[in-house]
């Protein structure tokens, strides 16, 4: 429960100078008592407005009953005794040009169910029981050496009621919690939570940055969801969109009749791809609005982290546009956005210890997960390069894969440059891209076998994991945000096999330190064989960076049975099977290994060798029976000259791309020298900036429309 601060000069000045990180404690609608009278204090930022009043159920939407008083620095406020929790309201704003528009509260914590959009006065009251979880989260911190397996879930379409309406957050809590616990995920990442008017935006065109969508219930219902998942040991992450906002007249757009939350110049402030506006990161009140939103979720709603959407669109002034305005150095980086992101991550980590800040950043921008001040300060970054290379490889007919063998080895060249999440997200199963299992070539059996191999390689490759809902039971259709998942698939043997595999992968990932402690370390993975291009076979070891315990991964990525295949190993003795994607439990044939004794023969630079039978399109994971620390594993440098040349050319291509403008070292210098936001422009209280503004982001449209 929060209490409003006095609307005095000192507190308003702190907001203007970016010293008040929770502006929602000052602005918005706050039930309170003044001079012994109960009512609601309303406050809003509209520096260029001619007149502002609050209208709602308490005054029959009459704009003359409760005018707001103009305060210092462009703020307006009033105490309304007639107002009470549960009533609807809006701000009636007469802008600089004389036009009057009813606006929803930017700091509103609850809204009507779409298509209606009025804000609702809300007295939040919830008894949390997750203090132990929050203490553990703070101790865990960045969790670089912990297993993190994320189940990405769209709250509006994971499941529905029998009548087709959305589940309540409380119902979702129990059903989702039971499923995620059974499958062994450590976290859920929820999209579509923050209030948005258009279902087809998937929640990526936000109008309520401080409010969970009312489609699924009240703020207390959402708190119940988070609290219940914490009781099951499941972390909760949210998708958060500080890169752009919709042009709907009732919300943030031209809030006081002029560009306010958005850049005034359309070359900086308008996303042509998505028909959305870009936040003005140079304006303190806007920066604090966004940082306050982030803190609302990680503090008040106990959320464990935010996946920041479309970071690339924020970083580059020329992102998806031909006309753009250079920064003060003549470059294409948005220095104000860089400063904002650094301040955001610093404040979030300080105010909510242990919360994870994850960037969806699709370029080679340096230092995304480097701590501030040298870097942006995120904890993790999505591995978009790994995703693109892996899908491009697995979508090919196996007969041609030998020509792109490097696509599955290249990630290891740069995997320690950032802290990565290997993400197969909602973006990969929409817009005719096909569901994951159907991306693979061949008949239905071949597709499932190949998909199982992909999943096993994903879970044994260094990096945290994220898988979108439905893909863990091989959903046979693209995601439809207007319909629940086809859960009947989960009861069919073909789909159940993939589901069993993901469950087993999560189990091994959580239990085996060699599968997660070295995610961000060079020694966490070593190639045994990275150059068998003709057979499309890969072999690598995962190693616990503390005990030295290790496991061996062998992937046969063609539909060819390979008998007596030789793999070098550093340790003699007996081995056992930890996992085979060809097991009958997973939908395979159940190929057996007749002999798992290492022979004293040299292979792949190792002193011993195993002779294995490799099932078609499969991954086999082994461990030595007599576990012993092993340090002499062949590293990724152990590539053939041909593969080294391919890797060199690929790396060179990345450098050429980085050199576009400016060079990477210049970019790194700019990042390091750009301080976290310390107070940029504050909005003038009497004069509006001219021009329009409209930005561009990553790719929203149907995706995030």
UniProtKB/Swiss-Prot annotation:
Its EC number is 2.4.1.18. Residues 654-705 are annotated as: Disordered. GO terms for molecular function: 1,4-alpha-glucan branching enzyme activity; cation binding; hydrolase activity, hydrolyzing O-glycosyl compounds. One of its GO terms (cellular component) is cytoplasm. It is an enzyme of class 2 (transferase). Residues 691-705 have a biased composition (Basic and acidic residues). Pathway: Glycan biosynthesis; glycogen biosynthesis. Keywords: Carbohydrate metabolism, Glycogen biosynthesis, Glycogen metabolism, Glycosyltransferase, Transferase. It comes from the Bacteria. The keyword Glycosyltransferase applies. Catalyzes the formation of the alpha-1,6-glucosidic linkages in glycogen by scission of a 1,4-alpha-linked oligosaccharide from growing alpha-1,4-glucan chains and the subsequent attachment of the oligosaccharide to the alpha-1,6 position. This is 1,4-alpha-glucan branching enzyme GlgB. It comes from Deinococcus radiodurans (strain ATCC 13939 / DSM 20539 / JCM 16871 / CCUG 27074 / LMG 4051 / NBRC 15346 / NCIMB 9279 / VKM B-1422 / R1). The lineage of its organism: Bacteria, Thermotogati, Deinococcota, Deinococci, Deinococcales.
């Amino acid at each position: 429960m929060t209490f409003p601060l006095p609307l005095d000069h000192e507190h308003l000045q702190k907001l203007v100078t970016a010293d008040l990180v929770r502006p929602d404690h000052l602005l918005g609608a706050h039930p309170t008592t003044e001079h012994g009278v109960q009512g609601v204090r309303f406050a809003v930022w509209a520096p260029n407005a001619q007149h502002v009043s609050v209208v709602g159920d308490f005054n029959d939407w009459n704009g003359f009953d409760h005018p707001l008083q103009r305060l210092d620095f462009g703020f307006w406020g009033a105490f309304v005794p007639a107002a009470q929790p549960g009533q609807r309201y809006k701000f009636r704003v007469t802008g600089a040009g004389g036009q009057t528009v009813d606006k929803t509260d930017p700091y509103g914590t609850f809204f009507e169910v779409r298509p209606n959009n009025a804000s609702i006065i809300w007295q939040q009251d919830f008894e949390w029981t997750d203090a132990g979880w929050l203490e553990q989260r703070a101790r865990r911190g960045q969790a670089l050496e912990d297993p993190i397996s994320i189940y990405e879930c769209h709250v509006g379409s994971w499941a529905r009621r029998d009548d087709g309406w959305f589940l309540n957050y409380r119902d979702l809590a129990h059903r989702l919690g039971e499923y995620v616990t059974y499958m062994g995920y450590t976290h859920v990442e929820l999209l579509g939570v923050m209030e948005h008017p258009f279902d087809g935006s998937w929640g990526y065109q936000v109008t309520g940055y401080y409010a969970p969508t009312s489609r699924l219930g009240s703020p207390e219902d959402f708190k119940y969801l988070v609290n219940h998942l914490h009781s099951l040991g499941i972390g909760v992450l949210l998708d958060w969109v500080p890169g752009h906002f919709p042009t709907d007249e009732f919300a943030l757009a031209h809030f006081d009749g002029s560009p306010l939350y958005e850049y005034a110049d359309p070359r900086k402030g308008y996303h042509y791809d998505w028909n959305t506006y870009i936040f003005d990161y140079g304006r303190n009140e806007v920066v604090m609005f966004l940082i306050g939103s982030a803190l609302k979720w990680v503090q008040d709603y106990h959320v464990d982290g935010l996946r920041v959407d479309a970071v690339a669109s924020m970083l580059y002034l020329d992102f998806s546009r031909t006309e753009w305005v250079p920064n003060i150095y003549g470059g294409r980086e948005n220095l104000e956005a860089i400063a904002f992101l650094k301040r955001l991550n610093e404040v979030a980590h300080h105010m909510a210890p242990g919360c994870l800040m994850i960037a969806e950043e699709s370029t080679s921008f340096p230092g995304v997960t480097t701590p501030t001040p040298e870097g942006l300060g995120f904890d993790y970054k999505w591995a978009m390069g790994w995703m693109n290379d892996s899908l491009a490889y697995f979508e090919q007919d196996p007969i041609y894969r030998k020509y792109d063998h490097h696509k599955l080895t290249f990630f290891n060249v740069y995997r320690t440059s950032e802290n990565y999440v290997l993400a197969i997200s909602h973006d990969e199963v929409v817009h005719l891209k096909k569901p994951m299992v159907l991306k693979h070539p061949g008949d239905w059996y071949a597709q499932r076998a190949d998909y199982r191999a992909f999943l096993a390689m994903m879970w044994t490759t260094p990096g945290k994991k994220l898988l979108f809902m439905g893909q863990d039971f091989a959903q046979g259709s693209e995601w439809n945000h207007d319909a629940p998942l086809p859960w009947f698939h989960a009861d069919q043997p073909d789909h159940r096999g993939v589901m069993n595999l993901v469950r087993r992968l999560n189990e091994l990932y959580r239990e085996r330190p060699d599968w997660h402690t070295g995610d961000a370390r060079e020694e966490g993975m070593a190639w045994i064989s990275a150059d068998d291009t003709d057979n499309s076979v890969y072999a690598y070891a995962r190693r616990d960076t503390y005990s030295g315990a290790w496991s061996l991964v062998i992937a046969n990525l063609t539909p060819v049975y390979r008998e007596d295949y030789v793999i070098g190993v550093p340790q003699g003795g007996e081995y056992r099977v930890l996992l085979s994607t060809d097991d009958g439990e997973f939908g395979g044939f159940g190929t057996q290994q007749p002999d798992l004794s290492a022979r004293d023969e040299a292979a792949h630079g190792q002193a011993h060798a195993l002779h294995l039978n490799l099932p078609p399109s499969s991954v086999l994971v082994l461990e030595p029976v007599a576990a012993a620390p092993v340090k002499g594993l062949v590293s990724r440098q152990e590539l053939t000259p041909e593969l080294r040349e391919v890797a060199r050319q690929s790396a060179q291509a990345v450098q050429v791309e980085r050199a576009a403008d400016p060079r990477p070292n210049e970019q790194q210098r700019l990042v390091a020298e750009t301080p976290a936001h310390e107070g940029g422009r504050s909005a003038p209280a009497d004069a509006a900036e001219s021009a329009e503004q409209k930005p561009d982001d990553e790719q929203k449209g149907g995706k995030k429309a």
